[in-house]
Amino acid sequence: MQNFEIDYVEMYVENLEVAAFSWVDKYAFAVAGTSRSADHRSIALRQGQVTLVLTEPTSDRHPAAAYLQTHGDGVADIAMATSDVAAAYEAAVRAGAEAVRAPGQHSEAAVTTATIGGFGDVVHTLIQRDGTSAELPPGFTGSMDVTNHGKGDVDLLGIDHFAICLNAGDLGPTVEYYERALGFRQIFDEHIVVGAQAMNSTVVQSASGAVTLTLIEPDRNADPGQIDEFLKDHQGAGVQHIAFNSNDAVRAVKALSERGVEFLKTPGAYYDLLGERITLQTHSLDDLRATNVLADEDHGGQLFQIFTASTHPRHTIFFEVIERQGAGTFGSSNIKALYEAVELERTGQSEFGAARR
């Protein structure tokens, strides 16, 4: 079975300069390369091990044109590196994957690519590099040897996971597809209830552990919630957020906040109750409260996470900063803890249990 790692993430954008400026100015990414053809313009950005490609269509012939009309700016391609593109492509298509583009070599003779369908209209470009792994995406000119990324203690090291919203009823078939076509395995599964809302979630991961997809569908038997809202506003399945990992979430959030990134606010009651759930090992309660960073733990250790406020015109995609100190799960207890903390502040009750419905 083929092994996969993240090579780059491509987002389709309405305005290339505006989108690139935001990533460089607010998130401290650096421009690593550019690409242009008769139907598109692209910029490759780099920070840590993250390569982000932004593409603006210049012709209706480019698939970005139809994507943007339907969804607005968003993730269109999660490209994955593998040692044998032809074998991976053939196995995936044989197992039912949509064949988007057959394997072919680029002008860079050492690079072979192919493309298959993923979820919704998001695809996976498969990339085989016979040279160094630090090369630009195919078709780009420039240099990956950038020196100004990560400045100001932002330090986004890589991509921890993608959170993906699916239509109700599509979770099981999508999980089975990634297992069958790409050899992913399930590592986590849960049903989350938050008040009258509920969702089902399954996490699938490549054999190497380098590509992690958190797949989520709304529970048809519960009230509509944030997953339903995303599906409505995005007009279909798609990437809800990208989680960037950091060695120090508190420091990263301080640096990003100074650069103008807005994060979701956490009710003070959450921190009043946090000590009942967790004995903090890394960060102080005061630091977490000051930065709105959430904390959780599992049998492996602790994690610290925070979500940005969405700046998308449709309020769809947003981003996450996550620091793992041994934890292997995804902070699901924070969803319930935040809900109950909001209830405490809303009702003015002093006892945690009294806020439960």
Swiss-Prot record:
Listed InterPro entries: 4OHPhenylPyrv_dOase, 4OHPhenylPyrv_dOase_C, 4OHPhenylPyrv_dOase_N, Glyas_Bleomycin-R_OHBP_Dase, Glyas_Fos-R_dOase_dom, VOC
Cofactor remark from the record: Binds 1 Fe cation per subunit.
Keyword annotations of the record: Antibiotic biosynthesis, Iron, Metal-binding, Oxidoreductase, Repeat
Reactions performed catalytically: 3-(4-hydroxyphenyl)pyruvate + O2 = (S)-4-hydroxymandelate + CO2
Superkingdom: Bacteria
Keyword Nucleotide-binding: no
Binding site for substrate: H161, S201, T214, H241, Q305
GO molecular function: 4-hydroxymandelate synthase activity; 4-hydroxyphenylpyruvate dioxygenase activity; iron ion binding
Pathway this chain belongs to: Antibiotic biosynthesis; vancomycin biosynthesis
Pfam family, one: Glyoxalase
EC number of this enzyme: 1.13.11.46
Residues the entry annotates as binding Fe cation: H161, H241, E320
Keyword tRNA processing: no
Assembly, per entry: Monomer.
Family stated for the protein in its record: Belongs to the 4HPPD family.
Protein name: 4-hydroxymandelate synthase
Organism: Amycolatopsis orientalis
